[in-house]
Amino acid sequence: MINPTRARRMRYRLAAMAGMPEGKLILLNGGSSAGKTSLALAFQDLAAECWMHIGIDLFWFALPPEQLDLARVRPEYYTWDSAVEADGLEWFTVHPGPILDLAMHSRYRAIRAYLDNGMNVIADDVIWTREWLVDALRVFEGCRVWMVGVHVSDEEGARRELERGDRHPGWNRGSARAAHADAEYDFELDTTATPVHELARELHESYQACPYPMAFNRLRKRFLS
């Protein structure tokens, strides 16, 4: 039986020998206000290679403005609910509708276009559903993807949400639970108290020390086998 890691390395080498461009993807997955965007921007400035930042917000804010208003959004975009659970904390949850699902699928296809043209991408994400995760696994088949978990403490996440002023209470809490529910990571970072430039350096060092990421392979075995 062929070792999947060796087979994957061979594909990368054959692509390089053929002169084919090979874009790489770093996927930062975590809840709202976990610090993913700040981390991505700091990483861009630190890295010697060019990394394009294509975050989820770029596509989220491309939706019609009315559909970003929780009081007016139509169910074909998404529905949402908020509840105080047994822990006494408020949890906010988004349930994507078909239009939001299609927008996120299109986002993954757009990122894939960059990779296929030899451009590296760092993308911050909130993987709200298992379906989004499975879609990413399919779209990025054959690509080198570093899956990075980005975490923040509940207290600090709530403080950041309040400071932003445009988030429903419990948004960070609920989105973090959804994002990490099915995920596996090549490495993880906690943004609670560490300065972003230090986290960017840690991310860059971890990326360099891990030339053949395996988290996506493990996830494919779980969900696509």
From Swiss-Prot:
Top-rank EC class of the record's enzyme: transferase
InterPro entries documented for this protein: CPT, P-loop_NTPase
Keywords: ATP-binding, Nucleotide-binding, Transferase
Keyword Nucleotide-binding listed: yes
Record flagged with keyword S-adenosyl-L-methionine: no
Signal peptide: none
Molecular function GO terms recorded: ATP binding; transferase activity
Enzyme Commission code: 2.7.1.-
Similarity section: To S.violaceus chloramphenicol 3-O phosphotransferase.
The protein's name in its UniProt record: Putative O-phosphotransferase Mb2669
Organism of derivation: Mycobacterium bovis (strain ATCC BAA-935 / AF2122/97)
Lineage of source species: Bacteria, Bacillati, Actinomycetota, Actinomycetes, Mycobacteriales
